[in-house]
Amino acid sequence: MSTIRLTILIDYCGEIVEIVPFLFDIIQETHKDIYKETTEEIVKGNSNEGQSISPPPHQPSTDQADIEALKDSYDDFLYVSKAFASCSINSLIATARIYGLNPAPIKGARVLELGSSCGGNIIPQALYYPEATFTGIDLSSVQIKHGNELIESMGLTNVTLLEKDIMDIDDDFGTFDYILVHGIWSWVPDIVKDKILSICNRNLSDRGIAYVSYNTYPGWKRLEQMRDIMLYSEKQLKSQSLQERTVYTKNVLKLLGETMNMDQRSQERSGYKIANINSVLASNDYYVGHEYLETFNDPVYVSEFIERA
């Protein structure tokens, strides 16, 4: 079976300065209610001369516990579901035709979205394209429930949301003309990454298009520095909810940005770094939490993705 795979790349660029050593002393002093029992552990963790403050690189696990943890995370801290123009059916068809391909027509098309959340990306398309059918799956029962309530209230009959693990999709699930995977691939364990690519091969129709977005290098080399700072600053707060940890780490970045702004030389040399901090601070908490504080965020070079696919 011949398939069409179009890869849409999301390339984030940013950079963060090395953290000021005394910054955590200030943070601990101003957040005694949270850090009252952690000072000893932080000092112990920095006892070696020249030791890096960044956490060790995450080693992806294939344990089912990681998948369950992701489900709990999105159940507890909902990710607001939105429509993305880049993976709308008309956009994918137009892009395919530009490259000389002959994609499946919208009429009668079957569309599958992996990690659909509340359906914010496919419900508008189901409304706009009544002759196509849409199926979204997501681990989060809470998000699926919200999405189905919206579908019912709108009286739509051509879109379905299912609480389902990507790992459970097999050949019997059927084939689809369009498979959408927006904001999922970089944020799941390797075993799920491989399963996504398998679905894009085995469950894609002959004239199908698979859309996969992911974080890429080299742009994310810079943002990983910011992620390291956030992970380090919240590593003693694992008993707190993701939402609480997100608020806390944004305050850390705010303090870092204010500290840099106090120094004229930093402003002149690192204005773009301050801008990156401000960009995170201006972002919604649900985005920052799931983007920077989840267990998995694995950017790759485009060539690496192509080799893996």
Which role fits each region the language model picked out?
Residues 170-179:
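A short acidic, Gly/Pro-enriched loop at the edge of an enzyme's catalytic core
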Residues 194-206:
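A short glycine-rich, Lys/Arg-flanked "PGG" loop and its adjoining helix->strand segment in the class I
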Residues 76, 84-109:
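Conserved alpha-helix/loop element of class I SAM-dependent methyltransferases that forms part
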Residues 140-142:
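Conserved SAM/SAH-binding beta-strand->alpha-helix loop
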Residues 118-131:
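Conserved SAM-binding loop of SAM-dependent methyltransferases across substrates and taxa
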Residues 155-166:
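Conserved SAM-binding strand-loop segment of SAM-dependent methyltransferases
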Residues 133-138:
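Conserved SAM-binding motif I beta-strand of class I
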Residues 209-240, 255-265:
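Conserved class I S-adenosyl-L-methionine
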